[in-house]
């Protein structure tokens, strides 16, 4: 399929909308009421610091809802307002936040059911409205919905669309797209659907394995087995790694994406020399500004004298996981939670580890005066952050009285 032509045709269709429906002002008031927080604004105004009793909260200077997420949520609310009686679906979670997705269900916005790992689009009627989430949808899903005659509301973040344009350029130049991301993540699935040949690497270690294969060759069968679920159909590492371009899932660690880009640039330079480098390597800046800002703010925050770190965001939120990784690499006691209810008591907190395991830690909140660092992922409303901070204040106040 000519994905570029298909996308252009879809965007000119009368059933396609990516600009909203003119209800922005009304929806903005509703979103402010449901998701914003006067406490969080107070902390911002106090140089991102608030002290109550024995607790000092230090808030990262960039956290929470990014522009792309705000836009996606606002468009979903607008869609419900514009189509008050129609059936509305979302191809996946609108964003990776449980409270926001619960709100979608309360608004009678349905999620496409998944059977045995596959989405069941048979539930979608020809006249239904379908929202594409902030991290996009695959070309195949868009084509299916277009053929059904559905009204498509596209909330894909422009930064994600920028990555799609990048892999289109790779394809035009007959370059294989090496995508830094998680092959199961919805954004990477969407991005790879726009690519020609592609290979998805999770981290620098996997990238180094590929670079070594390019330079020295390795066991071909081992390579194909290692990346069986992370490459395009019919991928041939002996042919398809002669010309490569770099792209990324926008929520990955900025520094690691940059390292991977430099690694492959050096690899192709070493193999083909400076004269032919541009024929064999392409790189465009596809690092999301919001992701970069939140990671940079986290790197600054963990340099402070903190007793512990709270990272708030959906457990399937990649950008939140990266924030947690930064904290743990610093050696801080750090707890990734998605909702305030994970904090059971002064003595018990349920949290997600980097390996995905949900564990309970006892005696997590130190006695006496403490400084708590707080940040949140790009899909986390300020109201959720407020709930967590108030819970910590309340727990410490109770122990102080006792």
Swiss-Prot record:
Where do the annotations place (2E)-4-hydroxy-3-methylbut-2-enyl diphosphate binding? 96, 185, 250, 317-319, 379
Disulfide connectivity for this sequence is none
Query: Which keywords are on file for this protein?
Result: 4Fe-4S, Iron, Iron-sulfur, Isoprene biosynthesis, Metal-binding, Oxidoreductase
Give one Pfam family.
LYTB
| Catalytic residues in the record | 187
Pathway(s) served? Isoprenoid biosynthesis; dimethylallyl diphosphate biosynthesis; dimethylallyl diphosphate from (2E)-4-hydroxy-3-methylbutenyl diphosphate: step 1/1; Isoprenoid biosynthesis; isopentenyl diphosphate biosynthesis via DXP pathway; isopentenyl diphosphate from 1-deoxy-D-xylulose 5-phosphate: step 6/6
Please tell me where dimethylallyl diphosphate binds in this chain: 96, 185, 317-319, 379
Enzyme category, top tier: oxidoreductase
**Cofactor annotation remark:** Binds 1 [4Fe-4S] cluster per subunit.
Binding-site list for isopentenyl diphosphate = 96, 185, 317-319, 379
The UniProt entry, under InterPro entries, shows:
LytB/IspH
Q: Which reaction does it catalyse?
A: isopentenyl diphosphate + 2 oxidized [2Fe-2S]-[ferredoxin] + H2O = (2E)-4-hydroxy-3-methylbut-2-enyl diphosphate + 2 reduced [2Fe-2S]-[ferredoxin] + 2 H(+); dimethylallyl diphosphate + 2 oxidized [2Fe-2S]-[ferredoxin] + H2O = (2E)-4-hydroxy-3-methylbut-2-enyl diphosphate + 2 reduced [2Fe-2S]-[ferredoxin] + 2 H(+)
Residues engaged in binding [4Fe-4S] cluster: 66, 157, 288
EC assignment: 1.17.7.4
GO molecular function terms listed in the Swiss-Prot or TrEMBL record: 4 iron, 4 sulfur cluster binding; 4-hydroxy-3-methylbut-2-enyl diphosphate reductase activity; metal ion binding
GO terms of biological process kind: dimethylallyl diphosphate biosynthetic process; isopentenyl diphosphate biosynthetic process, methylerythritol 4-phosphate pathway; terpenoid biosynthetic process
Q: Which family does it belong to?
A: Belongs to the IspH family.
This protein is called what?
Answer: 4-hydroxy-3-methylbut-2-enyl diphosphate reductase
The protein's organism comes out as: Trichormus variabilis (strain ATCC 29413 / PCC 7937) (Anabaena variabilis)
């Amino acid at each position: 399929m000519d994905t570029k032509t298909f996308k252009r045709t879809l965007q000119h269709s009368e059933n396609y909308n990516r600009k909203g429906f003119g209800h922005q002002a009304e929806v903005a008031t509703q979103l402010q009421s449901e998701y914003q927080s006067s406490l969080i604004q107070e902390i911002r105004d106090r140089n991102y610091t608030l002290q109550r009793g024995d607790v000092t909260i230090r808030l990262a200077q960039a956290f929470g809802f990014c522009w792309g997420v705000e836009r996606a949520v606002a468009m979903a609310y607008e869609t419900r307002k514009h189509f008050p009686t129609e059936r509305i679906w979302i191809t996946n979670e609108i964003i990776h936040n449980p409270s926001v997705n619960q709100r979608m269900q309360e608004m009678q916005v349905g999620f496409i059911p998944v059977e045995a790992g596959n989405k069941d689009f048979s539930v979608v009627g020809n006249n239904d409205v379908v929202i594409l989430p902030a991290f996009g949808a695959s070309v195949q899903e868009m084509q299916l919905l277009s053929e059904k005659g559905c009204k498509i509301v596209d909330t894909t973040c422009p930064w994600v669309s920028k990555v799609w344009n990048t892999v289109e350029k790779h394809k035009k130049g007959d370059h294989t797209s090496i995508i830094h991301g998680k092959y199961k993540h919805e954004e990477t699935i969407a991005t790879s659907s726009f690519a020609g040949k592609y290979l998805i690497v999770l981290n620098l270690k996997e990238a180094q394995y590929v670079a070594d294969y390019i330079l020295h060759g390795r066991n071909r069968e081992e390579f194909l087995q290692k990346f069986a679920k992370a490459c395009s159909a019919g991928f041939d590492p002996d042919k398809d790694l002669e010309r490569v371009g770099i792209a990324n899932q926008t929520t990955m660690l900025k520094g690691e994406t940059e390292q991977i880009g430099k690694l492959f640039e050096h690899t192709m330079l070493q193999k083909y020399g400076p004269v032919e480098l541009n024929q064999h390597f392409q790189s465009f800046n596809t690092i999301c500004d919001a992701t970069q800002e939140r990671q940079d703010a986290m790197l600054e925050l963990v340099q402070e004298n903190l007793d512990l770190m709270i990272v708030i965001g959906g457990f399937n939120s990649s950008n939140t996981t990266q924030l947690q990784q930064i904290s743990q690499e610093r050696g801080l006691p750090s707890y990734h939670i998605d909702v305030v209810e994970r904090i059971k008591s002064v003595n018990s907190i349920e949290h997600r580890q980097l390996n995905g395991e949900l564990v309970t830690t006892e005696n997590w909140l130190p006695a006496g005066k403490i400084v708590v660092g707080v940040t949140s992922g790009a899909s986390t409303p300020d109201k959720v952050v407020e709930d967590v901070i108030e819970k910590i204040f309340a727990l410490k106040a109770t122990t102080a009285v006792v």
